[in-house]
């Protein structure tokens, strides 16, 4: 597995959770002897929603909401078997979406 890389994509609505998860992944990978590139912050996706407040009249009365999706990218170079096992056993926060890709 010396020629393979692991690319990890993290997504979350809370930037503190995603930074904490990225820190845990980098510490775990470095502890097992792998080299880590990142975390690289990717552009934040902002979804905006406009909702009418009144059910009948007053079209000018509206509320606006926003959901921000934060993303981070990590590359683990030259992972060992211990690195893969440690990453699979790692328990991350519930609000973080993790995607692993072997390259």
From Swiss-Prot:
GO terms for cellular component: ribonucleoprotein complex; ribosome. SUPFAM superfamilies: Ribosomal protein S10. Keywords: Ribonucleoprotein, Ribosomal protein. GO terms for biological process: translation. GO terms for molecular function: structural constituent of ribosome; tRNA binding. It holds the Pfam family Ribosomal_S10. Belongs to the universal ribosomal protein uS10 family. This is Small ribosomal subunit protein uS10. It comes from Hydrogenovibrio crunogenus (strain DSM 25203 / XCL-2) (Thiomicrospira crunogena).
């Amino acid at each position: 597995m010396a020629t393979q890389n692991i690319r990890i994509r993290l997504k979350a609505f809370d930037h503190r959770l995603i930074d904490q998860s990225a820190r845990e992944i980098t510490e775990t990978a470095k502890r097992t002897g792998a080299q880590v590139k990142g975390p690289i912050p990717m552009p934040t996706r902002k979804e905006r929603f406009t909702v009418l407040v009144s059910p009948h009249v007053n079209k000018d009365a509206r509320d606006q909401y926003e959901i921000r999706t934060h993303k981070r990218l990590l590359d683990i170079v030259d992972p060992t078997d211990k690195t893969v096992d440690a990453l699979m056993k790692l328990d991350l926060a519930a609000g973080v979406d993790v995607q692993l890709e072997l390259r």
